Amino acid sequence: MLNNRASKIGAILLALFFVLTYLFPLNSRLLWQPDETRYAEISREMVVSGNWIVPHMLDIRYFEKPIAGYWINNISQLIFGHTNFAVRFGSVISILLSALLIYLLARMMWRNRQVAFVASLIYLSMFLVFSVGTYSVLDPMLALWVTASMVCCFWALKATTAKTRILAWITLGLACGMAFMTKGFLALAIPVIVMIPVTLYQKQFTRMLLYGVLAVLSAALISLPWVLAVAKAEPDYWHYFFWVEHIQRFSGDDAQHSSPFWYYIPIILLGVIPWLGLLPGALTSAWKKRRKRPELFFLLCWFVVPFLFFSIAKGKLPTYMLPFMGPLAMLMAKYGVDCARKFKMKALRINGYINIFIGVAAVVAILIIQLVSSKPIYMPYEWSKWVLAIVAFSLWGIIGYLCSTLNGKHWLWAASCSLGVSLCIGQAIPNSSIDGKLPQEFIRQNIDTLNASKYIVSNSVGVGAGLAWELQRSDIYLYERTGELTYGIEYPDSQHRLLKPESFEQWLENARKEGNVSVVITYKDPKKLAQMPRPEELVTNRRMAILTYEKRK
């Protein structure tokens, strides 16, 4: 057990780690397209318009996600203003609250502050958690509500009185309702598919069916006002959201992001870094002790069942695993603390060796690609960036070495392996990535030209959202490609926002009578630019170009 002094020091160090990893770099990093520019602009438009019911992007209906994740981002922008920090803070606060829930659940399970503290530390320092948790997507919000749901599930299973049991199931329903309003119907399935094997194992399946009605009612109670409001405002919303976004995306032959069954295995192995050395022992130990320790079986089901469920699905993304990193953090924390308490330090030392290997391998890979490969990551004038990347991964290896010395005594310092990467990544991104995936810099360099334009056109939805965010205007036109706005742009009041190549010159001629026109084009082949009408001004960064057509009388 931790004494009071050790608890205070641990809390201070954990808070410092959180500030350096999660908060300090937020505003300095440019927004990635299409994800971060998308969520930044959707919430900006909600705040400006006051419409918190129906999501729009570029003033075009956007039905791909429900509303609750946007609400968190909206509140963040209202508090922190028009900043990159505000765009990402919704993800950060969701991960922080998830870590607090993990601490609470670990205390409920083991009544041990040390294990609970280590579980939160491991969770916050996992590669998948901190990389997605400092990135503006909706998965951290989903992870928060799924974690809250699972805490309520365990609370309901352990409740000894009818009053407590009723309260737990009602609270579970509220958390599930928020998960549904963040990501949709699949979020409702997660607690169900986890609880079925758990309640069967603990002979509480009938009780789950009985009290589960309360969860269904409370989930409906919290979500029904928005469900009815969006149906009234946009009658077609639920048709698109259910059939296209769920049925086709999850199981259809044309599912988005289709990947093989084993896709999530390497994602998990990479995602638990810098704690990979603890994973095999934690899983095998939990499986062996599952009969005597039902909480370990609960955590195994929380991870394994959704892992298999999403592996069967055809559409896959790395971020889908985020809600299931919590149980792994708790299993590894329990295993690691038990190993240290029993002086069985082999796994803790191995974890240090793995981090040494990661640091050394990353440094060697950067040097080989940069100095030997015919296609280096960085241009010659970017030498400071790849040196910075080498320093960051060297720090990873050095910390791994410290964790492996003294028989693994300092094994918890593995959490700080990623500090160098987290603090340096924004400054170490090669210009080739900035030019293509981080449009903010190019937009800011040409902000006066863009602000002077009556019409702005882009052939990329992600870049278009970035333009709208930076210029604080949503009337961006789309050229040739509609991407994720394909459904919304088919509405009669939005069709004019799509400009097709065969009619573009005529549209341009008419538009120039009203003012300047700026066309922002993403391209790989310069021949793409030659296909456009000749502009008065052309600015390019080799991946994007701004073609400016001046006003004509």
Curated annotation (Swiss-Prot):
UniProt-recorded Gene Ontology molecular function terms: 4-amino-4-deoxy-L-arabinose transferase activity; mannosyltransferase activity
Superkingdom classification of source: Bacteria
Pathway this chain belongs to: Lipopolysaccharide metabolism; 4-amino-4-deoxy-beta-L-arabinose-lipid A biosynthesis
InterPro entries cross-referenced by the UniProt entry: ArnT_tfrase, Glyco_trans_39/83, LipidA_mod_glycosyltrf_83
Enzyme type, top EC level: transferase
Keywords associated with the record: Cell inner membrane, Cell membrane, Glycosyltransferase, Lipid A biosynthesis, Lipid biosynthesis, Lipid metabolism, Lipopolysaccharide biosynthesis, Membrane, Transferase, Transmembrane, Transmembrane helix
GO cellular component: plasma membrane
Places the protein is found: Cell inner membrane
Pfam families: PMT
Catalytic activity: 4-amino-4-deoxy-alpha-L-arabinopyranosyl di-trans,octa-cis-undecaprenyl phosphate + lipid IVA = lipid IIA + di-trans,octa-cis-undecaprenyl phosphate
Annotated EC: 2.4.2.43
The keyword NADP appears for this protein: no
Example GO biological process: lipid A biosynthetic process
Function of the molecule: Catalyzes the transfer of the L-Ara4N moiety of the glycolipid undecaprenyl phosphate-alpha-L-Ara4N to lipid A. The modified arabinose is attached to lipid A and is required for resistance to polymyxin and cationic antimicrobial peptides.
Family in the record: Belongs to the glycosyltransferase 83 family.
Protein's recorded name: Undecaprenyl phosphate-alpha-4-amino-4-deoxy-L-arabinose arabinosyl transferase 2
Organism listed in the record: Proteus mirabilis (strain HI4320)
Gene that produces this protein: arnT2
